[in-house]
Amino acid sequence: MIFGSRRRIRGRWGGSGPLVRGLGTLGRALSLVWRRSLQLRVVTLTLGLSLAVILVLGFVLTSQITDRILEVKVKAATEEVERARNTVSGIVGGEESRSLESSLQLARNTLVDRKADVRADMAGAFDAVLVVPGDGPRAAAAAGPVAQIPEALRDFVKAGQVSYQYATVQTEGFSGPALIVGSPTTSSVPNLELYLIFPLNNEESTIALVRGTMATGGVVLLGLLAAIALVVARQIVQPVRSASRIAERFAEGHLTERMPVRGEDDMARLAVSFNDMAESLSRQIQQLEEFGNLQRRFTSDVSHELRTPLTTVRMAADLIYDHSEDLDPALRRSTELMVNELDRFETLLADLLEISRHDAGVAELSVESLDLRSTVRSALDNVGHLAADAGVELTLDMPEEDVIAEVDPRRVERILRNLIANAIDHAESKPVQIRMAADEDTVAVTVRDFGVGLRPGEEKLVFSRFWRSDPSRVRRSGGTGLGLAISIEDARLHQGRLEAWGEPGKGACFRLTLPLVRGHKVTTSPLPLKPASEQRPARRRSNKDREAAEESV
């Protein structure tokens, strides 16, 4: 039975899930609007402060008006009590033939029926109560609703004081709040107490009217303040919004956008300052574009101009190298060094030309649909001798099935060749892992070494041109310092990603992620960039891949 009750409770609360989620969504939407709208915050803050001021002012004014009305009422009631006391003294002590109850009733009727008196009209209508407490052999006597008189007030009157008190009374002709004024009398009847009950219905109506009028005026005033705040905030926010829109268009490349200048106030000075800043930025951007164009043109022109003399030098060097056996050992060694440096110089010129094409935006893809595994094997064939010279073991892990992708095989092979050669340079004779994996949309290749690694922040710098983490390290691959910079440009040309991870002493990992179909956007990668801490060298490659790698090495 208990478990059933719990299930019912959970079901009842579970039904409120959509409501809670809806309220959460609404709250987030309102919070977003609040954070993004300066005008809304200004108007809301103005209304909040105005409402607080109106409430405080209304409370103070209402309290003062109420106190003043009641003060006038108490004063008029006190004067009426003085007149009533004289009337009661004359009636009660006039004829001894009447009984005490008759005298008290006659005095009460006289007081109540005295409506023509102008002075009584100032205090308003009232009811009278006459009380004579019992004293020894004399019995107590009273006239009027004596039960409505508070005992605390009677105690003050018995002590000979004229006092008043607010109380809620219920008589034959009235029910509600009233002012009760009590006073002792000086008549032949000792200890005679006189009480006048003044209804406060007129005063209540007046106070309610005052409160209603002030509330209505406060609402109207609050609405006017809201309209004024909206107009003022709009006057302030409009130039800011205009500046924001123009800044966005300026960031999009519309360098001629400027803010309109109206008047000579603070907003006008803001517009002038903004326009001056935009003009300065536009001028600097144009200068940088001109410098960049000059730099790219210089790089391209120099690379082309150097090709002609380099070709001549290459022909002469090859001729000398072909007859190097006839030279003495020193000249033979010099010839070999010259040929090697010419090879490196030619590679540098080719890389500079490729960089200039990327900078000029004229690099194009020659897309083919092929099995990307063959491209990986081709890259291994080109750098296998480097691994053999450095004593580095290359492990390959690729899928058994074909991985068909629409890529430029020359550029992808160059990316992989640069990554593997870079890993061999920094592996410190430790293994280098090459892994490939694919999903429905993308294919990824990671190159992992366990060498010196990367310091924090260097995972971005490795793709900079001519950047080296350790200038004293010798490149086994004879690179130019532009390989990774060209590789990341080639990856972007495929709409792919080239990312790096590394830690000092733990090695580095480079991940290339490409779309299987040209034009698709890469959002995820089938391989992780940061390896798990317990990760060991990858599983052994297939027989076909092993044979291909062994042949290349």
UniProtKB/Swiss-Prot annotation:
Q: How does it assemble?
A: Interacts with MrtA.
Q: What is this protein called?
A: Sensor histidine kinase MtrB
Record the organism. Answer: Mycolicibacterium smegmatis (strain ATCC 700084 / mc(2)155) (Mycobacterium smegmatis)
Q: List every stretch annotated Disordered.
A: 523-553
- Which residue intervals are annotated with compositional bias (Basic and acidic residues) in the record? 544-553
Catalytic activity from the UniProt record: ATP + protein L-histidine = ADP + protein N-phospho-L-histidine
What are this entry's molecular-function GO terms? ATP binding; phosphorelay sensor kinase activity
Sorted keywords for this record are: ATP-binding, Cell membrane, Kinase, Membrane, Nucleotide-binding, Phosphoprotein, Transferase, Transmembrane, Transmembrane helix, Two-component regulatory system
Organism placement in taxonomy:
Bacteria, Bacillati, Actinomycetota, Actinomycetes, Mycobacteriales
Q: Which GO terms describe its cellular component?
A: plasma membrane
Transmembrane parts of this sequence: 42-62, 213-233
